[in-house]
Amino acid sequence: MFYKNDQIAGFDDSIWQAMEQEDKRQQDHVELIASENYTSARVMQAQGSQLTNKYAEGYPGKRYYGGCEHVDVIEQLAIDRAKELFGADYANVQPHSGSQANAAVFMALLKPGETVLGMSLAHGGHLTHGSKVSFSGKIYNAVQYGLNEATGEIDYEEVERLAKEHQPKMIIAGFSAYSRVVDWQRFRDIADSIGAWLFVDMAHVAGLVAAGLYPNPVPIADVVTTTTHKTLRGPRGGLILAKQNDELAKKLNSAVFPAGQGGPLMHVIAAKAICFKEALGEGYVEYQQQVIDNAREMAKTFQTRGYNVVSGGTDNHLFLLDLIDKGITGKDADAALGRANITVNKNSVPNDPQSPFVTSGLRIGTPAITSRGFGLEEAAALTGWICDVLDDISNEQVIDDVRSKVLDLCEKNPVYR
């Protein structure tokens, strides 16, 4: 028998201690990983609710289990809010992750062995855009495009050339480490010229799109996927969106369930619905604008200190720092900044001589620091401290001094007030 007041503490102290330590880490560290953010307490409340008990295979009104009348309401609210938020005619809120949402798109639109054209992981793409270590590169014939070496921006002429040469059945637009606005219409035109599907993965910029601060691909692409965390600031999960197309909707639904997943996670779907409502509410546009402003301030400050920002700046929430000319690896920079309580992630840069396990760059993003209240002043100061560490990366005294400043900044700006 279970009781409502049962607690982890005192029952499983090993797990509780790790949870408490992670809570302290989040409070005492500055989070600059572009794919991470903080959810609201409301989102966490839904994820820790009794909804986790309910199996609900199928879709609202068409379940394989009884007792789904209330979770049907929840899932339909999530669907309706997602469609309103992104101007879509179709939404599937069941994917457990962005990668599973992407896998469903592949399954719905392609046959094994057919050709896809996506951005190279080494140039800012994602594993599921055709990497050889992913299902997308193992099951399908993946061709990869990259960035223009001179500008650090997508080489659309290369995309067009590769599309004509390889005749892919699907072109993928989207990224995991690209700081500029993507020309969705240019991709549409290229796809149309060869009769290919256009699939957009907007996982990183979905929050900016929802706020109207980044071009919306939904009216342009055949299918759009996103995660529900990152800039969208919701629970970890996936989402598929599309325009009106009944045949395509049927294929996508079948690719999610039963082809790719079994029962949906109703506690996560409830959290998604709450996240969408938050994104439709007051203050959301201002938050996303501050995310962009903070990223631009950081990129500008890095450049002032003599650091190379790929593409020369940013139009969204992230940018890549190229450390090749500094003689520093991304791995060493990541570790040194971690000791200063600044969390980043090492990242490959275009034409990186290092392996993906070492890299020559850092990916830096501002969604999380903006969620805890950082503005331009804090963003500039933080960037200066990062430069101090990287300028003298073996100096532990400098790292200790920066760590003290970071702790003070974090204390003044708690994650949850």
UniProtKB/Swiss-Prot annotation:
Needed cofactors, names only, are:
pyridoxal 5'-phosphate
Q: Spell out which residues are annotated as carrying N6-(pyridoxal phosphate)lysine.
A: 230
Q: Which SUPFAM superfamilies match?
A: PLP-dependent transferases (SSF53383)
Name listed for the protein in its UniProt record: Serine hydroxymethyltransferase 2
Species assigned in the record: Colwellia psychrerythraea (strain 34H / ATCC BAA-681) (Vibrio psychroerythus)
Q: Where are the residues marked Plays an important role in substrate specificity as a site?
A: 229
- Coiled coil start-end: none
Q: Which domain of life is it from?
A: Bacteria
Catalyzed reaction equations: (6R)-5,10-methylene-5,6,7,8-tetrahydrofolate + glycine + H2O = (6S)-5,6,7,8-tetrahydrofolate + L-serine
- Subunit structure as annotated in this protein's UniProt entry: Homodimer.
Q: Which keywords does UniProt give here? A: Amino-acid biosynthesis, Cytoplasm, One-carbon metabolism, Pyridoxal phosphate, Transferase
Residues at which (6S)-5,6,7,8-tetrahydrofolate binds: 121, 125-127, 355-357
- One Pfam family from the UniProt entry? SHMT
UniProt similarity note = Belongs to the SHMT family.
Pathway listed for it is:
One-carbon metabolism; tetrahydrofolate interconversion; Amino-acid biosynthesis; glycine biosynthesis; glycine from L-serine: step 1/1
Give the Gene3D superfamilies listed for this entry. Aspartate Aminotransferase, domain 1, Type I PLP-dependent aspartate aminotransferase-like (Major domain)
Function, as annotated, reads: Catalyzes the reversible interconversion of serine and glycine with tetrahydrofolate (THF) serving as the one-carbon carrier. This reaction serves as the major source of one-carbon groups required for the biosynthesis of purines, thymidylate, methionine, and other important biomolecules. Also exhibits THF-independent aldolase activity toward beta-hydroxyamino acids, producing glycine and aldehydes, via a retro-aldol mechanism.
Q: GO molecular-function annotation terms? A: glycine hydroxymethyltransferase activity; pyridoxal phosphate binding
* NCBIfam families hit by this protein: PRK00011.1
User: Any idea of its EC number?
Assistant: 2.1.2.1
Q: Where in the cell is it found?
A: Cytoplasm
What InterPro entries does the entry give?
PyrdxlP-dep_Trfase (IPR015424), PyrdxlP-dep_Trfase_major (IPR015421), PyrdxlP-dep_Trfase_small (IPR015422), Ser_HO-MeTrfase (IPR001085), Ser_HO-MeTrfase-like (IPR049943), Ser_HO-MeTrfase_PLP_BS (IPR019798), SHMT-like_dom (IPR039429)
